[in-house]
């Protein structure tokens, strides 16, 4: 048996078509495009590539995208002032600060400064809390993309055993919560977990986000499992580098029923989910039309509407 390769680009295109239609309806109704502001600090090559991809996708989806590029020596206070400005801007529905940030800037302070209703990455504690309690809110883009990819090949999620390898606040923890909210039975593993291979072999759905190239091998995977590889690792080769995931694709494809490739799997869905979150923010903000800001630049907003 050779696994079905889940085409993340094709699934992302289908989601993007839906989001584009929503964006056009929004523009027709409210006389402006949904707006996304992307903030990049420094000149990290990988971050620059990611920002370019996001802004280009936004424009092709009917979202007005603005880029704010700041030098690497930008102070934390200066960055926070920019975020305050974007929070107040009624033409900006979503704010994304590209990670990682320079060492002198605390990411927690920056991400918490973004209004929860404009937090398209879903990283604000308010949105994390809504996800944890099973309420509607903005879900981090990569976990949301993982769920959509699984739904594209799995007839039923209820009661499925899901194992998430990795406990980062960006992917691992929210991914576990996303599948728990879908009525799956979820186990989350990390570097201190015992018998990681054994736990992985219990998974009907295996989500790997460990940041370790080729970590999950063929003998770690239950026959027929769905494997979602979130890892993106650069491996040096004679011509430069190649991208590989956290899963040994060549071996695991002969055991799994379906598997995502790297590249071309989770990555495109992450960007598509970002567009979906941006339009959702625009729709919610337009409906509520909030007029009052609190002193700390938090909108009086019913987050369950997002």
Swiss-Prot record:
| Protein known as | Bifunctional protein FolD
Note the Gene3D superfamilies from the entry. Leucine Dehydrogenase, chain A, domain 1 (3.40.50.10860), NAD(P)-binding Rossmann-like Domain (3.40.50.720)
Copy the pathway line from the protein's UniProt record.
One-carbon metabolism; tetrahydrofolate interconversion
One biological-process term from Gene Ontology?
purine nucleotide biosynthetic process
Q: Which InterPro entries match?
A: Aminoacid_DH-like_N_sf (IPR046346), NAD(P)-bd_dom_sf (IPR036291), THF_DH/CycHdrlase (IPR000672), THF_DH/CycHdrlase_cat_dom (IPR020630), THF_DH/CycHdrlase_CS (IPR020867), THF_DH/CycHdrlase_NAD-bd_dom (IPR020631)
**Binding-site positions, NADP(+):** 166-168, 232
Molecular-function GO terms, alphabetical: methenyltetrahydrofolate cyclohydrolase activity; methylenetetrahydrofolate dehydrogenase (NADP+) activity
UniProt keyword annotations, A-Z: Amino-acid biosynthesis, Histidine biosynthesis, Hydrolase, Methionine biosynthesis, Multifunctional enzyme, NADP, One-carbon metabolism, Oxidoreductase, Plasmid, Purine biosynthesis
Report the sequence similarity comment from the record: Belongs to the tetrahydrofolate dehydrogenase/cyclohydrolase family.
* Functional description taken from the UniProt entry: Catalyzes the oxidation of 5,10-methylenetetrahydrofolate to 5,10-methenyltetrahydrofolate and then the hydrolysis of 5,10-methenyltetrahydrofolate to 10-formyltetrahydrofolate.
Keyword check for NADP: yes
What are the EC numbers? 1.5.1.5, 3.5.4.9
Organism of origin is Methylorubrum extorquens (strain CM4 / NCIMB 13688)
GO (cellular component) term, any one: cytosol
Q: Which residues form the signal peptide?
A: none
Q: How does it assemble?
A: Homodimer.
PROSITE patterns under this entry? THF_DHG_CYH_2
Give me the reactions it catalyses: (6R)-5,10-methylene-5,6,7,8-tetrahydrofolate + NADP(+) = (6R)-5,10-methenyltetrahydrofolate + NADPH; (6R)-5,10-methenyltetrahydrofolate + H2O = (6R)-10-formyltetrahydrofolate + H(+)
PANTHER family xref list: C-1-TETRAHYDROFOLATE SYNTHASE, CYTOPLASMIC (PTHR48099:SF5), C-1-TETRAHYDROFOLATE SYNTHASE, CYTOPLASMIC-RELATED (PTHR48099)
Which is an annotated Pfam family here? THF_DHG_CYH
């Amino acid at each position: 048996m050779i696994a079905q390769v889940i085409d993340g680009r094709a699934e992302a295109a289908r989601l993007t078509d839906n989001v584009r239609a929503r964006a056009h309806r929004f523009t027709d109704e409210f006389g402006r495009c949904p707006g996304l502001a992307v903030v990049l600090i420094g000149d990290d090559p990988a971050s620059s590539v990611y920002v370019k991809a996001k802004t280009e996708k936004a424009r092709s989806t009917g979202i007005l995208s603005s880029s704010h590029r700041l030098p690497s020596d930008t102070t934390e206070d200066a960055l926070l002032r920019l975020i305050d400005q974007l929070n107040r801007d009624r033409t900006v529905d979503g704010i994304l600060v590209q990670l990682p940030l320079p060492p002198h800037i605390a990411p927690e302070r920056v991400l918490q400064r973004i209004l929860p209703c404009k937090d398209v990455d879903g990283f604000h504690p308010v949105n994390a809390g809504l996800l944890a309690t099973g309420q509607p809110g903005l879900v981090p883009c990569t976990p949301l993309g993982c769920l959509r990819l699984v739904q594209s090949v799995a007839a039923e999620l209820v009661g499925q055993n899901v194992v998430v390898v990795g406990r980062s606040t960006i992917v691992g923890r929210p991914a576990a919560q996303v599948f728990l909210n879908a009525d799956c039975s979820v186990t989350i593993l990390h570097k201190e977990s015992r018998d990681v291979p054994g736990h992985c072999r219990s998974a009907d759905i295996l989500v790997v986000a460990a940041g370790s190239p080729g970590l999950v091998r063929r003998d770690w995977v239950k026959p027929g499992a769905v494997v979602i590889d979130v890892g993106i690792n650069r491996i040096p080769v004679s011509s430069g580098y190649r991208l590989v995931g956290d899963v040994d694709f060549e071996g695991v494809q002969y055991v799994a029923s379906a598997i995502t490739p790297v590249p071309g799997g989770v990555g495109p869905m992450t960007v598509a989910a970002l567009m979906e979150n941006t339009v959702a923010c625009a729709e919610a903000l337009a409906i509520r039309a909030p007029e009052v800001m609190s002193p700390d630049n938090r909108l009086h907003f019913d987050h369950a509407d997002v």
